[in-house]
A protein has these predicted regions:
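Short, conserved catalytic or adaptor-binding loops enriched in Gly and charged residues
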Residues: 20-28, 96-98, 182-183, 207-208
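An active-site-proximal beta-strand-loop segment
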Residues: 109-124
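Short amphipathic alpha-helical segments
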Residues: 17-20, 120, 179-182
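Mg2+-dependent endonuclease catalytic cores in nucleic-acid-processing enzymes, primarily RNase H-like
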Residues: 67, 71, 75, 123-125, ...
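ASCE P-loop NTPase helicase motor core
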Residues: 1-51
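ATPase catalytic-site recognition across NTP-hydrolyzing enzymes
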Residues: 37-111
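Conserved beta-strand scaffold positions in the cores of enzyme catalytic domains, especially
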Residues: 4, 32-35, 106, 189-191, ...
Length: 232
């Protein structure tokens, strides 16, 4: 016999800490406590509200409200999707117009090397970022199954056609070779760390969608938008 104290921030429900939390409710010799950040009188409530806007409701519930968030909780919701009207080298939201020449343009790359029907797609997503509003406009998306020799020519064309400043590629496994070949072709590459699972890496993007700062084009020529929304 003895005593034990278990302290942790909740992280999903498929783990020993959640099971311990649930089981302890009905054990006479156990006590359980939950202390959300707001319970700390030394922390400014305005700072907490600011964190909620920055992190999004899902991460905020876990990190600040000490809630167990189900791993199957949908992190992208359809009513978060917003749209802009493409103009002549501009993006329009209502009466506001954002000039492409004034924005920072880049792309992220999710690589897959195979043309088999069962293989994943290589996805290259181009963005334009307005620093004044922090709005992020999705301007283009390439999605197809590619063999390794076709990746660099495709990436190079997108890099120059969309006037990108850089492309982000994860530095992991065979992708390191892709990074090196891309740099040799004059493509500016920002190496991204793959140090988290895909869901964790998607949470900052989820927060920006929820805050209404990511926009898809409202354009019938952008046939990839529907597929992108379904993938999310």
């Amino acid at each position: 016999k003895g005593s034990a104290l278990f302290i942790s921030t909740p992280r999903g429900m498929n783990n020993w800490f959640y099971r311990l939390w649930v089981d302890s409710e009905n054990k006479e010799d156990w006590e359980r406590f939950k202390f959300p950040t707001i319970a700390n009188p030394r922390i400014d409530p305005e700072e907490i509200e600011s964190a909620k806007a920055e992190l999004g409701s899902i991460t905020f519930a876990q990190e600040y409200e000490a809630e167990f968030v189900n791993e199957t909780t949908q992190i992208f919701k359809a009513d978060w999707f917003k749209y802009y009207k493409p103009g002549v080298r501009s993006c329009k939201i209502g009466n506001d117009e954002f000039l492409m020449d004034d924005m920072h343009k880049f792309a992220t790359v999710d690589l897959a090397v195979s043309t088999k029907d069962s293989a994943d797609y290589t996805v290259i997503t181009s963005f334009a970022h307005d620093s004044a509003t922090n709005n992020l406009f999705v301007t283009d998306m390439f999605r197809d199954r590619l063999q390794a020799p076709d990746i660099i020519p495709t990436l190079k064309k997108i890099f120059y056609d969309n006037e990108l400043s850089w492309v982000g590629i994860e530095r992991a496994g065979y992708q390191l070779a892709i990074v090196q070949f891309a740099q040799r072709e004059g493509i500016v590459v920002k190496e991204l760390k793959a140090d988290k699972d895909k869901r964790s890496r998607a949470m900052p993007l989820s927060a920006k969608f929820e805050s209404g700062q990511i926009y898809f084009p409202d354009d019938e020529l952008a046939t990839w938008v529907g597929e992108a929304e379904r993938e999310l």
